[in-house]
Each structure stands twice: as structure tokens, then as C-alpha cells.
């Protein structure tokens, strides 16, 4: 498994490292982890005032300031990683690097150093989400799970995307720990206020509560039908 972990020295990227460390015993020896730092380029006017070698040393020094504490932390956890830094737009470069590896998983915080407090996701995370086709795990600014076994929610709607999510989770079950619990989640339509107009345009009585529940159950069953065989074959009983 190849994992790409973009870091910027923020508490959010520290949580990404903590999550990786919490999964280390589960990922196995074949896992490859790359730490990636993406630096903003110096303004063109400033860059023209120094030689290319000096400019590269500046970028290397800036990247090392971020790599050093991350490297120290992971080494203490017995985790070996590779490192890479790139200069450019963070979202664009993270997506490009994930494609180049190719990464089986990108792990990053929901925000970084430059995020605005009012955003649900930071601009870089949103940008990566919009650009990449690689699986992306977005971590909130909370401590890494202490227990090996995780509770995993998988949203399904009967589409190929829901099926792909289930296939990914089953292919990388070790990431979630032994004895992990898997929950299938489907959001059904709200029929509570549904009425049926008659030919004269008059509204007939709304659906009964039992009819609404029956319709919602049917939607749910249809949404999980494509993934039932996959789960059964893997010996996973979803909740």
C-alpha cells in the first residue's frame, strides 16, 4: 500500500502523522509512506535577485523545517518514510504527486496553515478533493483512534461509486484494524409530506407513516443490493 501524507507543520498535519502511527502495526511491512511538502514559490521579483542554487537551498531549508519534526516523530514510532518537496500550488501538486506514485491513499487534515476558520474544509483540501481520483482520507483536528478496531461508515446509493467505496474498504481491511465494524449508510428520500394529486388537481391524503417506512426500506435495500455479495465473500457482516 502506498500512502501519501502532505504536511505543512500545522496541528492538522500533525494529526495526520499521529493517525499513520496509530495504524502502523496494521499496515504491514509492504506499506510505503511518502511525506510531501509543497512550498509556495517566491515572488518572481524576489527570485530574480538570487541564483538558482541559492533559491534551491532556500526551498530545501524551508522544507527541512517541516520535515525535521515529522521525521523525528515517526522514527520514534518505528516508521520509515520517504520525503519529497515540490514548489507550486499545493492542491495541484498534491494531486499530481498522488497520481505519479500512484498513491493508494492520501491522508491529510481538513485544514492547514492557510485555512479560514469559517470553512468546513480548507482551500487546499477542497482543491485536492476536486482534482484527485486517488482515495482521500480527510482527518478532523482530533486525536488519532486509540483502539485498533475502528467503526467504519460507508455511504452507498446503489451507484458504482458506492460499490467502489466498499471494494476499497474490503481491499484494505487491515487499515481499520482487526475486528473493525462496518456500517452501510444510505440517505433515503423524505416522503413524510408526500401527497398525490387527483385528476382535478385536488390533493389526496398524505402517505401513512407505515407506507413511508416501507418506501424508505425499499430504497435502502436497493441501494445495498449491489454490495451484499462483495461483503459476504469477504466475510464481513455490515451493521
Map each language-model feature to its residues.
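Gly/Ser-rich helix-loop-strand patches that form or flank binding pockets
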Residues: 2, 11, 15, 25-26, ...
